[in-house]
Amino acid sequence: GFTQALIDLKDTMAGKTVYAVAGFGALAFENVSQGAALYSRSSDGKVGLARAAGTLDEATVVGFAQTAKNTGEEVRVLTVGVLATSGLDAGDPFYLATGYGGITSTPPSTAGQYLVRVGEASTTANLIIQLEPPILLS
């Protein structure tokens, strides 16, 4: 019956989990590394490295760089899905760091900085992208 059909389907499926990602392409106004948190400059729509210790513009994360790109090159910005990275603790929430393009499991707490949740670690090497708007700390 139905149960056997599900078992048969499971047996024929590949063993690897495939994660769907979605994003968009944009020109980089500075060099970006793979996995860097990015913001879109309001003046021209080009993307660069986001940071929690900058302006509201710089703290508004639009996604993560899928691959490293140089200034003037088009970078694919991942906005939904799973970002392959390293150094994570599974289950921990992650926030935009005060340094350019970085993320941290320790949320910023200094007045004048922005608190920006960007996702949650599903494993030590995968970040589930969950972008939230910045909150100015006072």
Which ranges hold each PLM region?
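Glycine-anchored, exposed beta-strand/edge motif detector
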Residues: 2-138
